[in-house]
Swiss-Prot record:
Gene3D superfamilies: P-loop containing nucleotide triphosphate hydrolases. One of its GO terms (molecular function) is ATP binding. Belongs to the DEAD box helicase family. DDX27/DRS1 subfamily. This is ATP-dependent RNA helicase DRS1. The gene is DRS1. ATP-binding RNA helicase involved in ribosome assembly. It comes from Saccharomyces cerevisiae (strain ATCC 204508 / S288c). Residues 448-639 form the Helicase C-terminal domain. Residues 19-34, 167-191, 200-209 have a biased composition (Acidic residues). ATP binds at residues 275-282. Keywords: ATP-binding, Coiled coil, Helicase, Hydrolase, Nucleotide-binding, Nucleus, Phosphoprotein, Ribosome biogenesis, RNA-binding. A motif (Q motif) lies at residues 231-259. Residues 124-142, 722-734 have a biased composition (Basic and acidic residues).
Amino acid sequence: MVVGTKKYSNLDFVPTISDSEDDVPILDSSDDEKVEAKKTTKKRKGKNNKKKVSEGDNLDEDVHEDLDAGFKFDLDADDTTSNFQGWNFLAEGESNKDDAEAFVKKDVDLDKIIRRKGGLVKMAHIDSKQEEETEKEKVEKENDSDDEELAMDGFGMGAPMNNGDENQSEEEEEEEEKEEEEEEEEEQEEMTLEKGGKDDEIDEEDDSEEAKADFYAPETEGDEAKKQMYENFNSLSLSRPVLKGLASLGYVKPSPIQSATIPIALLGKDIIAGAVTGSGKTAAFMIPIIERLLYKPAKIASTRVIVLLPTRELAIQVADVGKQIARFVSGITFGLAVGGLNLRQQEQMLKSRPDIVIATPGRFIDHIRNSASFNVDSVEILVMDEADRMLEEGFQDELNEIMGLLPSNRQNLLFSATMNSKIKSLVSLSLKKPVRIMIDPPKKAATKLTQEFVRIRKRDHLKPALLFNLIRKLDPTGQKRIVVFVARKETAHRLRIIMGLLGMSVGELHGSLTQEQRLDSVNKFKNLEVPVLICTDLASRGLDIPKIEVVINYDMPKSYEIYLHRVGRTARAGREGRSVTFVGESSQDRSIVRAAIKSVEENKSLTQGKALGRNVDWVQIEETNKLVESMNDTIEDILVEEKEEKEILRAEMQLRKGENMLKHKKEIQARPRRTWFQSESDKKNSKVLGALSRNKKVTNSKKRKREEAKADGNGARSYRKTKTDRIADQERTFKKQKSTNSNKKKGFKSRR
């Protein structure tokens, strides 16, 4: 509050509300102590401005030269919240593109090629009659949504699927139904065989109660933590700068996972936590980390926290989450170590020893081995986000190397939406009686997610046309964010070209793109420059882009866990969302659908989600498919032209590389060679071993006993004796008896 009355305008001492006028001291003023007022030098035009100048001159007489005239008290700083627009996917150095714009072209502009071929101009034409029919279908679907709910006795039961398929005769339908029944019987037999094998191997797969009691902290700790619910972040006894950062993000009430984990993490205990996608797991580990770092030694720069993540985009997002929460905390620094970005910039940043380093495993090991003055000797906290993915075969070697480099006396925090790792895989992490906190039932989708399934049958060739029609129905104006998941990078690229030729602007995200292209695709999608993003499972974990309304599974995932991560990109943080999945006829596809329906039925009391069968007008889709097939030559031309441009760019890059080698030969040769913890042969061997372990078949009890007998007998083969074996044994015994009898007779004669 500022006191600005004329009565006290010449006083150096300004009274407050609590001071009485009688107590105000009379201060003598001398000419020497007069402060010269700053005069305004800006020229102002107009009559109104002249008045402002005169008022400003009078005010300037009262302003001390050491004070900023434009300073204002922000009385409501703690209560105001910014309009949060999502996390930033620009890495350090990427946002300042003024200097970077001058660099040579590195990537092919695919949209430019598509426009040259007539695409991205206008949307593909749909007849008005068909549009009217689709509107009627929408109304019917809304009215009959309850009739379309899927039952547990198979896929499509309880839903009138494929009403629009008029070309199929009744005989063909009956034959298909018989085939499906036979397939289902075969699948059930396979499932029972698999179950039989698994039941026999319970000792190997499931952890015993004794092992859990020895490894984990008492269950009461986790149960008590889950019961605690806090009304706001103030009740968690967090510091004021952290609370201010949370308020700026609009965080008001802690989510269940945050209420359970933050108090335990502040105590320094190890945690293994799981909750549904979009429940605030990143903030659940970042808040206690920042709170603990407030009390670090101020004068000693060292890296105290390592956060490991499986993908680069997720690492960049988590880094931005941490920076936003710690924006009002002074002295906490962040470092990013991910592949695909400038290596030298990362080395310079890591030389300053940031408090928190967020990294992917490969680049983290690279920096530890090859970056000067970067070490992990003082690390106190290790965080593994998407921990179940990090513990899989692909990261096993890197993870073992990192565990050997980090100090053993540290706090470990493991988080994932599908955290179901066995003790055997967790032993290498050196956990110390971790507290196990599982907020939601395992393998459960978000509470407000509507899961829809489209049965493809034998129409795989119609999937591109189906995707186009579905996106047009779900988002005719192009104002919704839709994510499409595919199995292969080539499929994502081809679909982008097909959709572009049909007039739909889409982006792609997969491992074949450069890191700059990947970040550019995510940012364009986030800013709604491109409403549809076609991606592989690279984007299935962790990415939190606000207001993704629909997820489409163009290709079925390999497992139900991956399916949960995919559909978890929508219906986040209590919002509603929809997923549409194209289901084939394989047993794997059907098992995932069964698991999804089962999860919805088992958690009906806890969730508002539904599992529905979606009706499709296949006649209209076949018309669209004819248009797609007519573009096959154009698609091939675009792919060839793109390949040629890539070859030209690659040749130019090699030319520049050669020029640099000639110009800076001595500097380049003087650089030390970068080392790695594995040789090329070791990498190949680990890949082969990983493939063999993944393809290992489940054995039943008899086979397992035979294998155990072989192992005990040092490879000796055990089998039942045949008739010839028994005859041979009898002959041997007779010979032995004869020889013993003859020896006895000889001995008796010699005694005589």
